[in-house]
Regions:
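Terminal alpha-helical segments
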Residues: 1-165
Length: 165
């Protein structure tokens, strides 16, 4: 199973993929939210591998390791909630369902730029927490999402795409 650094390397690779999707694929908010979530998945799996030498394959086991009083990989409540929200935004993007997993609706819930902003805010919070905890750094990723304009995040910056005329 992958160790700490392998998960961090994959998270960084996924950040580069997020940047490329944002730059080259128009109106791809769903894929950007989903990619953001998988950056978070690898960061959390890196943390669990380092703190508890555990290697999980299900999202439920990961969440249990992150917020169980007896777990050596337990994280603070806000980071745990941010990870859960990021997961729910990804579910919405992948399955067109409501972010609230308990709500049922026949309506398709489309992912928009505002959802990417929320996903990046949650992911940024997770990255800040884990960078400090594990003394690591992540690259800053430029994202063209008007909803980010005026927002201050450590690892994500609004940058409008260049338009070739």
């Amino acid at each position: 199973m992958a160790e700490f650094q392998a998960h961090i390397n994959q998270a960084v690779k996924n950040l580069a993929t997020l940047s490329k999707i944002n730059q080259f694929i128009e109106d791809s908010w769903d894929w950007q939210v989903t990619t953001s979530y998988y950056v978070g998945v690898h960061i959390m799996n890196a943390h669990i591998a380092k703190m508890a030498n555990l290697h999980y394959t299900t999202h439920d086991k990961v969440k249990n390791a992150l917020y169980n009083q007896l777990s050596p990989a337990k994280i603070d409540q806000q980071t745990y909630l941010d990870y859960g929200k990021l997961e729910n935004l990804s579910r919405r993007a992948r399955y067109l369902c409501n972010e609230n997993s308990k709500a049922e609706s026949p309506v398709a819930f489309i992912t928009h730029d505002v959802h990417l902003k929320r996903a990046l805010e949650k992911l940024d919070s997770i990255m800040v927490y884990m960078a400090k905890l594990h003394s690591i750094t992540f690259p800053v990723t430029n994202i063209d999402c008007i909803e980010l304009k005026g927002t201050t995040l450590q690892y994500f910056k609004y940058q409008q795409k260049r338009v070739n005329i």
